[in-house]
UniProtKB/Swiss-Prot annotation:
<comment type="subunit">
    <text>Homotetramer; dimer of dimers.</text>
</comment>
<keyword id="KW-0235">DNA replication</keyword>
<dbReference type="GO" id="GO:0097367">
    <property type="term" value="F:carbohydrate derivative binding"/>
</dbReference>
<dbReference type="GO" id="GO:1901135">
    <property type="term" value="P:carbohydrate derivative metabolic process"/>
</dbReference>
<feature type="domain" description="SIS">
    <location>
        <begin position="34"/>
        <end position="196"/>
    </location>
</feature>
<dbReference type="Pfam" id="PF13580">
    <property type="entry name" value="SIS_2"/>
</dbReference>
<dbReference type="GO" id="GO:0006260">
    <property type="term" value="P:DNA replication"/>
</dbReference>
<dbReference type="InterPro" id="IPR035461">
    <property type="entry name" value="GmhA/DiaA"/>
</dbReference>
<dbReference type="InterPro" id="IPR001347">
    <property type="entry name" value="SIS_dom"/>
</dbReference>
<protein>
    <recommendedName>
        <fullName>DnaA initiator-associating protein DiaA</fullName>
    </recommendedName>
</protein>
<comment type="function">
    <text>Required for the timely initiation of chromosomal replication via direct interactions with the DnaA initiator protein.</text>
</comment>
<dbReference type="InterPro" id="IPR050099">
    <property type="entry name" value="SIS_GmhA/DiaA_subfam"/>
</dbReference>
<comment type="similarity">
    <text>Belongs to the SIS family. DiaA subfamily.</text>
</comment>
<dbReference type="InterPro" id="IPR023070">
    <property type="entry name" value="DiaA"/>
</dbReference>
<dbReference type="InterPro" id="IPR046348">
    <property type="entry name" value="SIS_dom_sf"/>
</dbReference>
Length: 196
């Protein structure tokens, strides 16, 4: 059992090292995409399922409340946080549309959709991205594995941050770290002296 525990930590560390080498450019581009949208008076919509939903809610909460230091609130909405809306849509047998309907209702040109999917194949996330494209929104996608169907939907202005792993637990761990990096970069770009 102890060896298995050490193996989990070792694998996580190795994935973090690989990500630290592979992802800084994509994370930087994503952060600047989010910052520019906010500076233009737009908002960030985010969504995910399961652990990815928790990461989406963590991001939105960090924007609306704060990340590590006090600063003005920033507009972000976790589309997976409203159980009444989700279950109303799903109750009409539109499970794949639970996020897309919200994107079509709330999203505007210049907004960003932060779409989080471990494998990139969740139908409701894919449909949300398709809806965001029709609303002239930019997409920041957090994926893993081979990026899945989601990776193929992204345009030139969009950003994919693909965790270099084929293990769901490692991908999800690194998604949380990536969300924290994005929050830190947004705060330090928009409010550079807040932590002094």
């Amino acid at each position: 059992m102890l060896d298995r525990i050490k193996g989990c930590f070792t694998e996580s560390i190795q994935t973090q090292i690989a990500a630290a080498e592979a992802l800084p450019d994509a994370i930087s581009r994503a952060a600047m995409t989010l910052v520019q949208s906010l500076l233009n008076g737009n908002k960030i919509l985010c969504c995910g399922n399961g652990t990815s939903a928790a990461n989406a809610q963590h991001f939105a909460a960090s924007m609306i409340n704060r990340f590590e230091t006090e600063r003005p609130s920033l507009p972000a909405i976790a589309l997976n946080a409203d159980n009444v809306v989700l279950t109303a849509i799903a109750n009409d047998r539109l499970h794949d549309e639970v996020y897309a309907k919200q994107v079509r209702a709330l999203g505007h040109a210049g907004d960003v959709l932060l779409a989080i999917s471990t494998r990139g194949n969740s139908r409701d996330i894919v449909k949300a991205v398709e809806a965001a494209v029709t609303r002239d929104m930019t997409i920041v996608a957090l994926t893993g594995y081979d990026g899945g169907e989601l990776a193929g939907l992204l345009g030139q202005q969009d950003v994919e941050i693909r965790i270099p792993s084929h293990r769901s637990a490692r991908v999800q761990e690194l998604h949380m770290l990536t969300v924290n990096c994005l929050c830190d970069l947004i705060d330090n770009t928009l409010f550079p002296h807040q932590d002094d």
